[in-house]
Amino acid sequence: MPDSVAVVTGASQGIGRATAIRLARDFTSVVLVARNRSHLEDTAAQVRAAGAGTRVIDLDLSAPAAARTVVDEALAAFGRIDTLVNIAGAVPQIDLFEMTDEQWDAGMALKLHGARRLTIEAWPALVEAKGSVVLMSGNSAIFPKAPYAAVGTINAAIAALAKAFSDRGITDGVQVNSVMPGAVLTGRRRSYLEHWAPAHGMTVEDAISRFPQEAEIERFGQAEEIAELIGFLVSPAARWMTGSTLRMDGGEVKSV
């Protein structure tokens, strides 16, 4: 296998971790980026077990200088960047009329601006490699709700940002797409349900069963399923796909 390097942000847990492990099958090296080093080391062990080399970079991508650091360390370690997968970014789920300016800014700083800055900093290496970029949005971009307005708003911005990058990528030879997952049962979602369920008079397992019924889907998605979709997007089989937004949500969004 020729040398190939993927950079995955948010790789310490959930979809980010699953994606890093999945890409270890197709790339010789995977650079893992997130804030929690101990969790990143756990991911790194699984990436190595899958056959790829790793580089762990623990920093906060909401800091403006962080993107340059990631690119510099990735290039110093492996000499190239073929794929960038922007997954990092937990957005506060707070009601539209209660969320402060500071909370809005914090939500955008990591998921939107962190991904934007990192893609820009990695762009020259991606152009050289004729590489690919994936940005993580979410199906709340299609049906934003007042109780978690920032989630839908920022996810919509991510989808638009990916379209803008893909427009430039047509000229520069860089493939850019975004992914819109639906309700995936990650550790973060389970933690949320552990707080939400007792406040609504039900067990966590009751809440896990109830949500898919209300969303008219069969079940929650799994992080590994989203990782497989991302694996396809950055594979040679999808090379002619750019500027697309791929939704995987178990059929939750019923629109055409």
Please annotate each region the language model reported.
Residues V5, S12-Q13:
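Conserved glycine-rich cofactor-binding loop
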Residues P124, D167-R168, R239:
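Alpha-helical segment proximal to the catalytic Tyr-Lys
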Residues I170, Q175, M241-G243:
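Short, small/polar-rich loop/turn modules that mediate ligand/substrate recognition or access, typified
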Residues F27-D42:
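Conserved glycine-rich Rossmann-like NAD(P)H-binding loop of the short-chain dehydrogenase/reductase
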Residues D95-L96, Q103-M108, F211:
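Substrate-binding pocket helix/loop in short-chain dehydrogenase/reductase
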Residues S132-I158, A162-T171, A183-V184:
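Catalytic loop of short-chain dehydrogenase/reductase
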Residues G14, F143, G231, T242-V256:
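Short C-terminal tail/terminal secondary-structure segment
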